[in-house]
């Protein structure tokens, strides 16, 4: 396999390039009988769509999904579901000045060294544009998990660059472009991003994703651990450089008497484990944190080399996200849902649950 498919029983194969005719995915293994229409998927795609605020790329893509197969009379048939999203606003000329050079921090150098050829238009296969099919597939996973188990997957931004965002309310999350759970912080975030765009620079972010309502018992020991698969999937999201569950790296400073979640007849007293022990879900909420690096396509000139290995100065023009973390929340939600539905089906196959 070439690393374009995620999942064991619920499999998603992603295809396309940023400036190609279309992008999409094939979802194989979706159980039959799930009510599904394009509107179910479109609602999630609209949350990720570019051009929705001044703080993200101004590329205007409608991201209208087309269901090509696997659905008949409004329900899934159990056969592969083909999903297509056409690219309509690519401006390939914006990349002519970097066609033979490499952006510091970008995958274009690694792609060229691996394949010996690269598509410089919008980053080609390495573009965050390719997260749209992931969100589309995740919408199906979310709907099945909710209908079968009442599982809810949602997320928010907890930090933008140097600005920490204290959690206030889930109700605040959909009301701003940042998916910030605290409306009072939004003006500060907007001012920071406005200055960042004027500087021609970029910044990173931290995203939190939470899955609630799943039962205990999902996951496998050793190599197919639930938390390992979550980390594997999340690292497939563009610009993610770190993944942790529960207390994560804070566990280093904790003592065992603090970190171990005490168990009472009413349930767990805390959730430092992030909902997973020994690679298997505990029934607690699964909590995942992502560290997202700054965008590498910036207007600030930086040193690099061209394909001949000669030193050059690189400046990236065109339309780019100054912080890819702003649109990352629905993508991270989709990835978590895809891992969970896969393990739910594996649990049902092995243990009948």
Swiss-Prot record:
GO BP annotation list: amino acid biosynthetic process; aromatic amino acid family biosynthetic process; chorismate biosynthetic process
Amino-acid positions noted as binding FMN in the UniProt annotation, renumbered to this chain: 125-127, 238-239, 278, 293-297, 319
Catalytic activity line of the entry: 5-O-(1-carboxyvinyl)-3-phosphoshikimate = chorismate + phosphate
Pathway listed: Metabolic intermediate biosynthesis; chorismate biosynthesis; chorismate from D-erythrose 4-phosphate and phosphoenolpyruvate: step 7/7
A GO cellular component entry from the record: cytosol
PROSITE patterns documented for this protein: CHORISMATE_SYNTHASE_1, CHORISMATE_SYNTHASE_2, CHORISMATE_SYNTHASE_3
Reported cofactor(s): FMNH2
Residues the record lists as binding NADP(+): 48, 54
Pfam families per record: Chorismate_synt
UniProt entry keywords in alphabetical sequence: Amino-acid biosynthesis, Aromatic amino acid biosynthesis, FAD, Flavoprotein, FMN, Lyase, NADP
Superkingdom, taxonomy of origin: Bacteria
Molecular function terms, GO-annotated: chorismate synthase activity; FMN binding
Bound cofactor: record note: Reduced FMN (FMNH(2)).
EC number from the UniProt entry: 4.2.3.5
Family: Belongs to the chorismate synthase family.
Subunit relationships: Homotetramer.
Function of the molecule: This reaction introduces a second double bond into the aromatic ring system.
Annotated protein name in UniProt: Chorismate synthase
Organism: Bordetella pertussis (strain Tohama I / ATCC BAA-589 / NCTC 13251)
Lineage: Bacteria, Pseudomonadati, Pseudomonadota, Betaproteobacteria, Burkholderiales
